[in-house]
């Protein structure tokens, strides 16, 4: 029975979106998903329903389309929106910047205009720690200077500005901006998880594919950083903790009756080799690696100060690195080719 209202989740079939839909359904919300599967898979939608015990409403469509979005709001009584729909590869954004600006900013602009027409103004936005660029001081809090070196990061930074301007122009808007650090792991059922759809861009899915035998070895970029073992340090966050952060944000918009911008991370960094060792322990497989030259633009350490999310929303990451690796391995082992 729906107790808390109906939430529209754009990009709800994706990695973070699917886990968030599970938590929303389990938490008493009804869910409407809009997704065009440009970087997700239809099987994820069915699996969301299997895990949650009840299915979301699903509409296949492009969140950039005003006609699609207007139809969604006309047919369904939407109480709030979580906006995930976006392209997300930094490398691809450097090759196809116009595609990223058109998709990531166009979908948000369409959403803002559609929400406004239908008198719905509670929005949780999926941002990224990419807006902080190359910080040399850690931990990173929300007051750190904002800058970024790639079109993907620019779209997130520009989207945050679009939302800030929208709020300034109309005090009825309530917007929660969530800056994620490094989502990893998978649902404990092994039914949903990250499906890179090719060569992984991020560390843990790459490590997982080495462990399962799909890739020969891991390249570790830099072994001479000023870190405990010389390899880079990042803040890895279990995707279920991240999903629950979105529910905390929805509740926060109602309770606080004002918007906010918060980091979502554990507040603790792990080196690349710590991740490798933890994944070997979780999987029982060796993960061969080779230390190579640093990549241009990398920093040695990047991790969040997530205290503001706890103070404002009561949210704190619960799962440790061992749990992240165990859940990610279960997904990879049970689904060696992802959803295919």
Predicted regions and their residues:
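Pocket-edge positions in alpha/beta enzyme catalytic cores
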Residues: 61, 73, 100, 143, ...
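Short, basic/glycine-rich phosphate-binding loops at helix/coil junctions
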Residues: 185-187, 224-225
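C-terminal substrate-binding subdomain of Rossmann-fold SDR/epimerase-dehydratase oxidoreductases
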Residues: 203-340
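N-terminal Rossmann-like NAD(P)+-binding domain of SDR-like oxidoreductases, especially those catalyzing
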Residues: 1-186
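Short-chain dehydrogenase/reductase
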Residues: 101, 149-157, 193-201, 205, ...
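Catalytic core of nucleotidyl cyclases, primarily class III adenylyl/guanylyl cyclases
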Residues: 189-191
């Amino acid at each position: 029975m729906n107790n808390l209202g109906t939430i529209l989740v754009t990009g709800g079939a994706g990695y973070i979106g699917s886990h968030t839909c599970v938590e929303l359904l389990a938490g008493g919300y009804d869910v409407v998903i809009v997704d065009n599967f440009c970087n997700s898979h239809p099987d994820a939608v069915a699996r969301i329903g299997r895990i949650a015990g009840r299915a979301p409403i699903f509409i296949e469509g492009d969140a950039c389309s005003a006609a699609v979005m207007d139809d969604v709001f006309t047919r369904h009584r939407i109480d709030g929106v979580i906006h995930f729909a976006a392209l997300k590869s930094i490398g691809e954004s450097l090759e196809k910047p116009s595609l990223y600006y058109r998709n990531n900013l166009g979908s948000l602009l369409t959403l803002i205009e559609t929400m406004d027409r239908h008198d719905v103004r509670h929005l949780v936005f999926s941002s990224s720690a990419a807006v902080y660029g190359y910080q040399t001081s850690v931990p990173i809090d929300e007051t750190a200077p904002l800058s970024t070196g790639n079109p993907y990061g620019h779209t997130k930074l520009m989207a945050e500005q679009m939302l800030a301007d929208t709020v300034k122009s109309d005090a009825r808007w309530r917007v929660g901006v969530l800056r994620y650090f490094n989502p990893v792991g998978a649902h404990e059922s092994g039914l949903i998880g990250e499906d890179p759809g090719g060569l992984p861009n991020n560390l843990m899915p790459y490590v997982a594919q080495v462990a399962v035998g799909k890739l020969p070895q891991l390249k570790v970029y830099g072994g001479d950083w000023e870190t405990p073992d010389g390899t880079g340090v990042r803040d890895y966050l279990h995707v279920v903790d991240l999903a629950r952060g979105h529910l905390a944000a929805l509740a926060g918009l109602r309770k606080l009756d004002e918007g906010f911008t918060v980091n979502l991370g554990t507040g603790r960094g792990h080196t690349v080799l710590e991740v490798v060792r933890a994944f070997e322990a979780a999987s029982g497989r060796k993960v061969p690696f080779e230390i190579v030259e640093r990549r241009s633009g990398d920093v040695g350490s990047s991790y969040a100060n997530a205290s503001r999310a706890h103070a404002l929303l009561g949210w704190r990451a619960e799962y440790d690195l061992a749990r992240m690796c165990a859940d990610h391995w279960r997904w990879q082992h049970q689904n060696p080719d992802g959803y295919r």
